[in-house]
């Protein structure tokens, strides 16, 4: 099945910015502050954990675990091929360290069980600890992606004098796309039910992307960059349920695409070393 049209499923997109009279489609700060306070006073107290939210959250957590597992499987196979090249022993040791870290984080996701006693509790009681953990593992994925596509790539080419044992451009692009999709989900998961995000619930990549966009004079109301699109606040537990279910589907299909691309790269390496054996 194809990945759903995700642009229509991001719950934070501002639908019609053309009606705003303020420059760059922004409301006066005083109005924004009042809207946030009204949301905290009147909407947040009504956002409660439901049985369906717990069920969907477990399904979404499984998608996070699947995402990490795709990397673990891919890295293990990559490491096996690196063993065939003695000059890459230090790079191989670094990847092994990443695998151990990802396995440790994944253990939490695989053993997570939603507490049914949380039903009717405030939604933030579920969102905040999970959101913080999601950010934690995504920061590791971010560092890993940089290592795979920059440092490791350059060192491998330098030491082997060819590009046979590096990630393909298609693989790099898919890894980046998938990472951004998962980041956007976590941003939505955290921000859709609270107008205040601080401390361990802030996402570096989102803040950095916004900062660069502002410095470059990009209209945040018109951009196609998913990380710059605003998160719309939900107004009921039922709305949160509906959007969470859609996100689960988006994550599922995106992770499947990543798995296919990783496998394509592995097949390329397999064919490469099989040919060398024949010689």
UniProtKB/Swiss-Prot annotation:
UniProtKB keywords: Cytoplasm, mRNA transport, Nucleus, RNA-binding, Transport
Compositionally biased residues, Polar residues: 1-12
Quaternary state and interactors: Homodimer and homotetramer.
Recorded GO CC terms: cellular bud tip; cytoplasm; nucleus
Record region (Disordered): 1-31
Full protein name: SWI5-dependent HO expression protein 2
Main location (coarse class): cytoplasm
Localization terms from the record: Cytoplasm; Nucleus
Physiological role: RNA-binding protein that binds specific mRNAs including the ASH1 mRNA, coding for a repressor of the HO endonuclease. Part of the mRNA localization machinery that restricts accumulation of certain proteins to the bud and in the daughter cell.
GO BP term, example: intracellular mRNA localization
One Gene Ontology molecular-function label: sequence-specific mRNA binding
Source organism of this protein record: Eremothecium gossypii (strain ATCC 10895 / CBS 109.51 / FGSC 9923 / NRRL Y-1056)
Classification via Pfam families: She2p
